[in-house]
Amino acid sequence: MRALKESEADGLFINPVIGEKKTGDFSTEIILESYKILIANKIYPDKSVLLGGFNTYSRYSGPREAIFTAICRKNLGCSHFIIGRDHTGVQDFYKENENKEFFNKLNNLEIELIFFNKIGFNSKQKKFANYSNSKSFKEISGSDVRASFKTNKKLPNWYMRKEIQNMIRLKINQKKKVFIQ
């Protein structure tokens, strides 16, 4: 939401990768259903969001893949592209700011890039924030999310909205495919 506000864009195109995934990833169905719930619950500005899957797969090639996906999104008509701290990297294989350094070496790709470093939750300020060593900073971990579902442990609402958790737990109870095996 911060990126949408800062970019002054007219809307948000949510374009998750829906192709082949690795073991342990959430299934495409769970990812798309989660976004549909967020849209239905008006988490995003009303009538300003489009959801469409990007039928490719992660190559785990860090900065090179960030360039590829940015160009693909530009070709889909996007004016901005968000790049996270470790965009399709493999744990700590790439340096923390390697994406940004790599993009700075290139000429204009004709798409505005929005870079994010490590994000977490500041429990004192009750909002998401860039990484800090503060005791009030709570890290977000995909591994912790997966583990919580395997042990049936509820996550705080700031970590994952309860509507999403409820949907995933229901799918697990229905023996639906939640994680790639």
Report the location of each language-model feature.
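Active-site cores that bind ATP or allylic diphosphates and position pyrophosphate for catalysis
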Residues: 1-181
